[in-house]
Amino acid sequence: MLITELRRSNFTLFLFPAATCDHARNMSSTSINGRGELNQLLRLAGPLIVNNLSIAGMNMADAMMSGRLGADALAAVAVGGSVWLLAFTLALGVLMAISPIAARYFGAGRPDMIGRYSRQGMYIAVAYGIPVVVFGQFLVGPLLALIGIDTAFRDLTTSYVGAIAWGAPAIYVFLALRFTTEGIGRTTPIMYTSVFAFVCNVFLNYVLMFGKFGFPAMGVVGCGLASAITMWLVALVFAWHIVVAPAYKPLKIFARLAPPRPEVLREIIALGLPIAITITAEVGLFAGMSILIGTRGTEITAAHQIALNFASTAFMVPLALSSAITIRVGQLLGRGDPAAARRAGGIGIVVCAGFMAASAIVLLVFPDFIVGMYTSDPVVSGIAVSLLLVAAIFQVADGVQIGAAGGLRGYKDTGIPMAINLFAYWLVAFPLAYLATITYVMPANFIWGAFVAGLTLAAVLLTWRFARLSRNSLTAS
């Protein structure tokens, strides 16, 4: 049924009936049919899925290899990684604004403007990266002391963050270049770079953490240093690729050293800061709910981590599709084809929902098998199975909300989505989770029910926002 609808040229009318037949008839000759649009989205998303899984693999490798050093080292990398994640997501969100901007200019046939925004994005990357280095070297220790972390564990965590922070300027410059590449629809180089990063990170972990090939064993410092070196290698390799690949020549990214342009910097930050706040709010929600569940005991906490890990892994696919939706919608709007942009967004949202529906079916049919891959503890297994059944409920909503968010970024609409997510996550989901936690009579799956409420509300509101905004764009055209 889904494929049949995707083949129809009036797919947008199927999803958003408010669009009129006149709008559909007025689509430009550059538009492609629903099946062709699906192929375009999957072509863009495929390499990004590999990229996301490679990043997840690096995090898993860090955890597994630091675990061989002992529980203290594993905990230090976990806590230090959370501190680093906060700094990383803030920059990630701001620099993500380059993707829809580049997509618009690419669709409009203005490669010179893409290069301008890419260069200014690198200024933002360096300006943000240097304070992160300073924070990692001098401020993490006092911060951990302030919240009461004991001295020995604090020293381990501080040394890890101090080492990984040296890579901040490089990884942020890479992000500026990566989102430029995304915007022009070249996602395959991103995939190759992420695989290269995974191999480098694991190899350098082995050498620096355990003292191989004549290097001293550095433990958690080696883990952080391996990540930092990998970040610099990735930035240099990707910059080299952009310099030598013919596809980037019209962009003239490195053709000259342009001074900072305040108006361009303001545009990137104004578009990207709401994205950064949205990502941070979502990361904060999951972290906060993990802390709340942690008050219920080790078995419930372990079960929560199992369910969250599987759900997060499945989320890598719609996350990549969301980026592909941003690219397609932005390019089609830049081309002056709002009807095709609306259709691309609608198809993307349905594909995200469809994949997550398939994931939900897997959770409903094979919960015991999935949990068995993580633990054999009967108590933890029983709780984890019940949480996976709740996770199956919010899978579709999670896919819809990330798909709609991707479409809205293509329209360069980030302020209202930020407000929607803050409301759904922190004024609905978290208070419900807190109430379920303090009552103690409610089982853990009631706490996870807060995920369902927040994500479902976000999905409904973001989809409504996309439908309205895309319809207004059609009317204006």
What name fits each language-model region?
Residues E5, T12-A45, A102-P169, F215-L273, ...:
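Short alpha-helical transmembrane segments in multi-pass integral membrane proteins
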Residues I32-M64, R68-L69, S82-I101, V126-V133, ...:
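N-terminal transmembrane alpha-helices
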Residues R43-D62, A163, F174, A197, ...:
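Transmembrane helical elements of multi-pass membrane transporters/channels
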Residues L53, G57-A75, L144-T151, V207-M218, ...:
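Helix-terminus/linker motif at the lipid-water interface of multi-pass membrane proteins
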Residues S54, M58, A87-A91, P131, ...:
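Residue-level hotspots within pore-lining transmembrane alpha-helices
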Residues L74-V134, I171-I190, S290, A303-P367, ...:
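Small-residue-rich hydrophobic transmembrane alpha-helices
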Residues L86-T89, V133, N201-N205, A235-A239, ...:
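Hydrophobic transmembrane alpha-helices of multi-pass small-molecule transporters
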Residues L95, S99, I164-G183, I190-F198, ...:
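Short runs within selected transmembrane alpha-helices of multi-pass transporters and secretion channels
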